[in-house]
Amino acid sequence: MTITPQEALQRTIEHREIFHDEMLHLMRLIMRGDMSPVMAAAIITGLRVKKETIGEIAAAATVMREFANHVEVQDNSNFVDIVGTGGDGSHTFNISTASMFIAAAAGAKVAKHGNRGVSSKSGSADVLDALGVNIDLQPDQVAASIAETGMGFMFAPNHHPAMKNIAAVRRELGVRTIFNILGPLTNPAGAPNQLMGVFHPDLVGIQVRVMQRLGAQHVLVVYGKDGMDEVSLGAATLVGELRDGQVHEYEIHPEDFGLQMVSNRTLKVENAEESRTMLLGALDNQPGVAREIVTLNAGTALYAANIAESIADGIQLAREAIASGKARAKVDELVRFTQQFKR
Protein backbone atom coordinates (compact mmCIF):
# COMPACT_ATOMS: atom_id res chain seq x y z
CA MET A 1 0.00 0.00 0.00
CA THR A 2 1.60 3.26 -1.14
CA ILE A 3 1.42 6.33 1.03
CA THR A 4 -0.28 9.49 -0.26
CA PRO A 5 1.49 12.85 0.06
CA GLN A 6 -1.25 13.94 2.50
CA GLU A 7 -0.64 10.87 4.69
CA ALA A 8 3.10 11.52 4.59
CA LEU A 9 2.57 15.11 5.67
CA GLN A 10 0.39 13.96 8.57
CA ARG A 11 3.15 11.53 9.57
CA THR A 12 5.73 14.34 9.74
CA ILE A 13 3.35 16.53 11.78
CA GLU A 14 3.06 13.67 14.29
CA HIS A 15 6.88 13.26 14.30
CA ARG A 16 6.58 9.70 13.00
CA GLU A 17 8.96 8.09 10.52
CA ILE A 18 8.17 7.58 6.85
CA PHE A 19 9.22 4.01 6.04
CA HIS A 20 11.73 3.05 3.35
CA ASP A 21 9.33 1.96 0.58
CA GLU A 22 7.05 4.91 1.32
CA MET A 23 9.96 7.34 1.05
CA LEU A 24 11.04 5.75 -2.24
CA HIS A 25 7.52 6.33 -3.59
CA LEU A 26 7.32 9.95 -2.39
CA MET A 27 10.78 10.83 -3.75
CA ARG A 28 9.93 9.32 -7.14
CA LEU A 29 6.80 11.50 -7.28
CA ILE A 30 8.91 14.58 -6.52
CA MET A 31 11.69 13.70 -8.99
CA ARG A 32 9.20 12.98 -11.79
CA GLY A 33 7.38 16.26 -11.13
CA ASP A 34 4.21 14.33 -10.19
CA MET A 35 3.74 15.96 -6.78
CA SER A 36 2.27 19.44 -6.51
CA PRO A 37 4.73 22.15 -5.41
CA VAL A 38 2.56 22.85 -2.34
CA MET A 39 2.68 19.22 -1.16
CA ALA A 40 6.38 18.85 -1.97
CA ALA A 41 7.17 22.01 0.01
CA ALA A 42 5.02 20.87 2.94
CA ILE A 43 6.59 17.40 3.11
CA ILE A 44 10.23 18.48 2.87
CA THR A 45 9.58 21.19 5.48
CA GLY A 46 7.80 18.66 7.71
CA LEU A 47 10.74 16.27 7.42
CA ARG A 48 13.14 19.05 8.40
CA VAL A 49 11.05 20.01 11.45
CA LYS A 50 10.73 16.44 12.72
CA LYS A 51 14.39 15.74 11.73
CA GLU A 52 15.06 13.33 8.88
CA THR A 53 16.00 9.79 9.93
CA ILE A 54 18.85 7.69 8.53
CA GLY A 55 16.28 5.49 6.76
CA GLU A 56 14.48 8.44 5.15
CA ILE A 57 17.72 10.00 3.92
CA ALA A 58 19.01 6.67 2.56
CA ALA A 59 15.76 6.08 0.66
CA ALA A 60 15.79 9.61 -0.79
CA ALA A 61 19.43 9.22 -1.86
CA THR A 62 18.61 5.89 -3.53
CA VAL A 63 15.98 7.60 -5.68
CA MET A 64 18.26 10.53 -6.55
CA ARG A 65 20.86 8.01 -7.69
CA GLU A 66 18.21 6.24 -9.80
CA PHE A 67 17.36 9.46 -11.63
CA ALA A 68 20.99 10.59 -12.13
CA ASN A 69 22.97 10.58 -15.37
CA HIS A 70 25.69 8.13 -14.34
CA VAL A 71 29.40 8.20 -15.08
CA GLU A 72 30.68 4.69 -15.80
CA VAL A 73 34.12 4.19 -14.26
CA GLN A 74 35.86 0.90 -15.09
CA ASP A 75 38.38 0.71 -12.24
CA ASN A 76 36.98 1.37 -8.75
CA SER A 77 40.23 0.96 -6.81
CA ASN A 78 41.49 4.02 -4.87
CA PHE A 79 38.45 5.87 -6.18
CA VAL A 80 37.24 8.70 -3.93
CA ASP A 81 34.92 11.70 -3.80
CA ILE A 82 35.92 14.77 -1.77
CA VAL A 83 32.82 16.81 -1.06
CA GLY A 84 31.12 19.05 1.46
CA THR A 85 27.47 19.78 2.10
CA GLY A 86 28.34 23.48 2.04
CA GLY A 87 26.19 25.80 4.09
CA ASP A 88 28.79 26.12 6.85
CA GLY A 89 28.90 29.90 6.42
CA SER A 90 32.69 29.99 6.63
CA HIS A 91 33.21 31.46 3.10
CA THR A 92 36.66 29.89 2.81
CA PHE A 93 38.45 29.16 -0.45
CA ASN A 94 37.72 25.81 -2.12
CA ILE A 95 39.62 23.44 0.14
CA SER A 96 38.07 20.21 -1.16
CA THR A 97 38.74 21.24 -4.78
CA ALA A 98 42.41 21.96 -3.98
CA SER A 99 42.55 18.60 -2.19
CA MET A 100 41.35 16.87 -5.38
CA PHE A 101 44.49 17.92 -7.29
CA ILE A 102 46.77 16.77 -4.47
CA ALA A 103 45.00 13.42 -4.00
CA ALA A 104 45.16 12.75 -7.76
CA ALA A 105 48.86 13.65 -7.82
CA ALA A 106 49.42 11.08 -5.04
CA GLY A 107 47.71 8.30 -7.00
CA ALA A 108 44.01 8.46 -6.10
CA LYS A 109 41.23 8.68 -8.66
CA VAL A 110 38.87 11.50 -7.72
CA ALA A 111 35.30 12.01 -8.93
CA LYS A 112 34.35 15.45 -7.64
CA HIS A 113 30.66 16.23 -7.62
CA GLY A 114 29.79 19.90 -7.20
CA ASN A 115 27.92 23.01 -8.18
CA ARG A 116 28.17 26.77 -8.32
CA GLY A 117 28.15 28.58 -4.99
CA VAL A 118 24.78 28.92 -3.28
CA SER A 119 25.70 29.43 0.36
CA SER A 120 29.38 30.14 -0.39
CA LYS A 121 31.11 32.96 -2.27
CA SER A 122 32.74 30.40 -4.57
CA GLY A 123 31.44 26.87 -5.23
CA SER A 124 33.68 24.15 -6.69
CA ALA A 125 32.27 24.83 -10.17
CA ASP A 126 33.07 28.55 -9.84
CA VAL A 127 36.73 28.06 -8.92
CA LEU A 128 37.32 25.35 -11.54
CA ASP A 129 35.80 27.68 -14.13
CA ALA A 130 38.15 30.45 -12.93
CA LEU A 131 41.10 28.04 -13.30
CA GLY A 132 40.12 27.43 -16.94
CA VAL A 133 38.61 23.95 -16.51
CA ASN A 134 35.69 23.15 -18.80
CA ILE A 135 33.09 22.04 -16.25
CA ASP A 136 30.34 21.34 -18.79
CA LEU A 137 31.21 17.74 -19.74
CA GLN A 138 28.97 14.84 -20.75
CA PRO A 139 29.08 11.69 -18.56
CA ASP A 140 31.31 9.77 -21.01
CA GLN A 141 33.72 12.73 -21.14
CA VAL A 142 33.91 12.81 -17.33
CA ALA A 143 34.71 9.07 -17.37
CA ALA A 144 37.48 9.73 -19.92
CA SER A 145 38.82 12.55 -17.73
CA ILE A 146 39.01 10.23 -14.69
CA ALA A 147 40.75 7.51 -16.74
CA GLU A 148 43.24 9.95 -18.29
CA THR A 149 43.99 12.48 -15.53
CA GLY A 150 42.79 10.74 -12.35
CA MET A 151 40.21 13.52 -11.87
CA GLY A 152 36.70 14.17 -13.09
CA PHE A 153 34.36 17.01 -12.21
CA MET A 154 30.64 16.31 -12.39
CA PHE A 155 28.66 19.54 -12.61
CA ALA A 156 25.52 18.70 -10.63
CA PRO A 157 22.92 20.19 -13.05
CA ASN A 158 24.28 17.97 -15.87
CA HIS A 159 23.90 14.82 -13.77
CA HIS A 160 20.71 15.47 -11.82
CA PRO A 161 18.25 16.89 -14.39
CA ALA A 162 15.24 15.71 -12.32
CA MET A 163 16.21 18.22 -9.62
CA LYS A 164 14.66 20.92 -11.80
CA ASN A 165 11.28 19.60 -10.62
CA ILE A 166 11.97 20.74 -7.05
CA ALA A 167 14.32 23.68 -7.75
CA ALA A 168 11.65 26.41 -7.62
CA VAL A 169 10.23 25.02 -4.35
CA ARG A 170 13.67 24.94 -2.73
CA ARG A 171 14.46 28.45 -3.93
CA GLU A 172 11.20 29.89 -2.61
CA LEU A 173 11.45 28.09 0.76
CA GLY A 174 14.96 29.45 1.25
CA VAL A 175 15.69 27.11 4.18
CA ARG A 176 17.75 23.95 4.42
CA THR A 177 15.87 20.78 3.55
CA ILE A 178 16.74 17.13 2.97
CA PHE A 179 18.08 18.12 -0.46
CA ASN A 180 20.97 20.03 1.13
CA ILE A 181 22.32 16.78 2.54
CA LEU A 182 21.53 14.56 -0.46
CA GLY A 183 24.10 16.09 -2.84
CA PRO A 184 27.16 14.45 -1.24
CA LEU A 185 25.30 11.10 -1.07
CA THR A 186 24.55 10.98 -4.78
CA ASN A 187 27.90 10.91 -6.60
CA PRO A 188 26.99 10.04 -10.22
CA ALA A 189 30.21 8.03 -10.63
CA GLY A 190 29.38 5.92 -7.57
CA ALA A 191 32.73 6.48 -5.83
CA PRO A 192 32.83 3.84 -3.06
CA ASN A 193 35.15 5.92 -0.87
CA GLN A 194 34.54 9.44 0.34
CA LEU A 195 35.71 12.35 2.44
CA MET A 196 32.49 14.23 3.22
CA GLY A 197 32.27 17.48 5.15
CA VAL A 198 28.99 18.39 6.87
CA PHE A 199 27.58 21.67 8.24
CA HIS A 200 26.26 20.35 11.59
CA PRO A 201 27.76 18.00 14.20
CA ASP A 202 24.61 15.83 14.31
CA LEU A 203 25.11 14.97 10.64
CA VAL A 204 28.44 13.22 11.28
CA GLY A 205 26.80 10.13 12.78
CA ILE A 206 23.79 10.33 10.47
CA GLN A 207 25.58 10.67 7.11
CA VAL A 208 28.17 7.98 7.83
CA ARG A 209 25.36 5.53 8.66
CA VAL A 210 23.45 6.53 5.53
CA MET A 211 26.58 5.71 3.50
CA GLN A 212 26.81 2.40 5.37
CA ARG A 213 23.25 1.56 4.25
CA LEU A 214 24.05 2.64 0.70
CA GLY A 215 26.92 0.13 0.55
CA ALA A 216 29.92 2.47 0.62
CA GLN A 217 33.37 1.06 1.45
CA HIS A 218 35.58 3.61 3.22
CA VAL A 219 34.04 6.93 4.22
CA LEU A 220 35.11 9.70 6.59
CA VAL A 221 32.39 12.22 7.46
CA VAL A 222 33.89 15.29 9.12
CA TYR A 223 32.77 18.41 10.97
CA GLY A 224 35.24 21.01 12.27
CA LYS A 225 34.11 22.18 15.70
CA ASP A 226 34.70 25.77 14.59
CA GLY A 227 31.83 25.20 12.14
CA MET A 228 33.76 24.13 9.03
CA ASP A 229 32.52 21.38 6.72
CA GLU A 230 36.17 20.30 6.31
CA VAL A 231 38.91 18.85 8.49
CA SER A 232 39.79 22.01 10.41
CA LEU A 233 43.05 23.59 11.52
CA GLY A 234 41.20 25.95 13.87
CA ALA A 235 39.57 23.38 16.16
CA ALA A 236 39.10 19.68 16.77
CA THR A 237 37.29 17.79 14.00
CA LEU A 238 34.54 15.24 14.65
CA VAL A 239 34.93 12.16 12.45
CA GLY A 240 32.51 9.37 11.60
CA GLU A 241 34.44 6.63 9.81
CA LEU A 242 32.95 3.69 7.91
CA ARG A 243 35.45 0.94 7.18
CA ASP A 244 34.92 -2.79 6.60
CA GLY A 245 31.22 -2.28 7.28
CA GLN A 246 31.83 -0.86 10.77
CA VAL A 247 31.26 2.72 11.97
CA HIS A 248 33.59 4.42 14.45
CA GLU A 249 33.21 7.98 15.74
CA TYR A 250 36.12 9.95 17.16
CA GLU A 251 37.83 13.35 17.28
CA ILE A 252 41.07 14.43 15.67
CA HIS A 253 43.20 17.52 16.36
CA PRO A 254 45.75 19.31 14.15
CA GLU A 255 48.42 18.62 16.80
CA ASP A 256 47.89 14.86 16.29
CA PHE A 257 49.64 15.29 12.95
CA GLY A 258 52.30 17.81 13.95
CA LEU A 259 50.24 20.73 12.64
CA GLN A 260 49.74 23.98 14.51
CA MET A 261 46.19 24.94 15.49
CA VAL A 262 45.50 28.25 13.74
CA SER A 263 42.38 30.24 12.96
CA ASN A 264 40.76 29.71 9.56
CA ARG A 265 39.97 33.44 9.33
CA THR A 266 42.75 34.06 6.80
CA LEU A 267 41.17 31.51 4.43
CA LYS A 268 38.09 33.65 3.71
CA VAL A 269 37.47 34.76 0.12
CA GLU A 270 35.00 37.12 -1.52
CA ASN A 271 34.79 35.47 -4.96
CA ALA A 272 36.05 32.70 -7.26
CA GLU A 273 39.06 34.75 -8.39
CA GLU A 274 40.33 35.11 -4.80
CA SER A 275 39.70 31.40 -4.26
CA ARG A 276 41.71 30.59 -7.41
CA THR A 277 44.66 32.69 -6.17
CA MET A 278 44.65 31.02 -2.74
CA LEU A 279 44.28 27.52 -4.22
CA LEU A 280 47.19 28.00 -6.63
CA GLY A 281 49.33 29.50 -3.86
CA ALA A 282 48.79 26.38 -1.74
CA LEU A 283 49.59 24.05 -4.65
CA ASP A 284 52.68 26.16 -5.48
CA ASN A 285 53.94 25.24 -1.98
CA GLN A 286 53.70 28.78 -0.59
CA PRO A 287 54.00 28.46 3.21
CA GLY A 288 50.88 29.41 5.14
CA VAL A 289 47.51 28.31 6.48
CA ALA A 290 46.07 27.55 3.02
CA ARG A 291 48.82 25.05 2.23
CA GLU A 292 48.49 23.41 5.66
CA ILE A 293 44.72 22.97 5.50
CA VAL A 294 44.74 21.45 2.01
CA THR A 295 47.56 19.14 3.09
CA LEU A 296 45.45 18.02 6.06
CA ASN A 297 42.31 17.47 3.96
CA ALA A 298 44.08 15.83 1.03
CA GLY A 299 45.87 13.55 3.49
CA THR A 300 42.53 12.53 4.98
CA ALA A 301 41.16 11.92 1.46
CA LEU A 302 44.16 9.70 0.62
CA TYR A 303 43.36 7.65 3.72
CA ALA A 304 39.71 7.39 2.60
CA ALA A 305 40.91 6.30 -0.87
CA ASN A 306 43.02 3.53 0.75
CA ILE A 307 46.22 4.96 -0.74
CA ALA A 308 47.50 5.74 2.77
CA GLU A 309 47.42 3.49 5.83
CA SER A 310 46.45 6.39 8.11
CA ILE A 311 45.66 10.11 8.00
CA ALA A 312 49.24 10.81 9.14
CA ASP A 313 50.64 8.78 6.22
CA GLY A 314 48.23 10.56 3.88
CA ILE A 315 49.48 13.96 5.06
CA GLN A 316 53.06 12.90 4.27
CA LEU A 317 52.01 11.81 0.75
CA ALA A 318 50.14 15.10 0.29
CA ARG A 319 53.22 17.10 1.33
CA GLU A 320 55.34 15.20 -1.20
CA ALA A 321 52.76 15.75 -3.97
CA ILE A 322 52.86 19.51 -3.34
CA ALA A 323 56.64 19.82 -2.87
CA SER A 324 57.38 17.84 -6.05
CA GLY A 325 55.17 20.14 -8.15
CA LYS A 326 52.95 17.19 -9.16
CA ALA A 327 49.84 18.64 -7.50
CA ARG A 328 50.22 21.97 -9.33
CA ALA A 329 50.81 20.14 -12.63
CA LYS A 330 47.47 18.35 -12.17
CA VAL A 331 45.65 21.70 -12.54
CA ASP A 332 47.16 22.29 -15.99
CA GLU A 333 46.52 18.67 -16.95
CA LEU A 334 42.81 18.93 -16.10
CA VAL A 335 42.48 22.27 -17.92
CA ARG A 336 44.15 20.84 -21.06
CA PHE A 337 42.12 17.63 -21.05
CA THR A 338 38.70 19.24 -20.50
CA GLN A 339 39.20 22.09 -22.98
CA GLN A 340 39.25 19.64 -25.90
CA PHE A 341 35.51 19.11 -25.29
CA LYS A 342 34.65 22.82 -25.45
CA ARG A 343 31.43 23.20 -27.41
Curated annotation (Swiss-Prot):
Task: Report the EC number(s), separated by commas if there are several.
Answer: 2.4.2.18
Q: Which reaction does it catalyse?
A: N-(5-phospho-beta-D-ribosyl)anthranilate + diphosphate = 5-phospho-alpha-D-ribose 1-diphosphate + anthranilate
**A single cellular component GO annotation:** cytosol
The UniProt annotation places anthranilate 1 binding at G84, N115
- What detail does the entry give on cofactor binding? Binds 2 magnesium ions per monomer.
The pathway to which it is assigned is: Amino-acid biosynthesis; L-tryptophan biosynthesis; L-tryptophan from chorismate: step 2/5
Q: Which PANTHER family does the record cross-reference, listed alphabetically?
A: ANTHRANILATE PHOSPHORIBOSYLTRANSFERASE
Family under the similarity heading: Belongs to the anthranilate phosphoribosyltransferase family.
Q: What is this protein called?
A: Anthranilate phosphoribosyltransferase
What is the gene called?
A: trpD
